[in-house]
Amino acid sequence: MKAKEIMNRKIEYIEFDATVYDAIEKMVDKRIRSLVVKPKDEEDVYGVITVRDIIFRVIGKKLDSQKIKVGEIASKPLVCVDKDIDIEHISSMMEKFNIARVFICEEKKILGVVALLDIMAGSLIEKAKGG
């Protein structure tokens, strides 16, 4: 099974200078676990902020989420893979880098995201098809 078959095409973005509080609101409202952080300028790259980042880097340290910018704690650069990569390769990358999602990119454009749950769901679908 290929990344393009299981990727989620709905990507939620947040500005580099938005507060972590803004990110928390958006993530809770949309019931999502990560946001792509837009570059601060043309020389910067996309990043990602996750529930895990917020809990461990802000809430767990009792920092003020209204004073910290998402760009300060975003992971950069995004881990990007080709849309035709096998999900087995993606899962080994996730294990190697201890990450829960990879982004499907093409010519600096983000096409989608594959998270751990997507791989699990893809595995179920493949088994149901007799694969």
Q: Where are the regions a protein language model picked out?
A:
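Short, surface-exposed, polar/charged, turn-prone segments marking secondary-structure boundaries
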Residues: 19, 41-43, 63-67, 75-77, ...
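Short N-terminal leader segment in a subset of presequences, especially plant chloroplast
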Residues: 8-17, 43
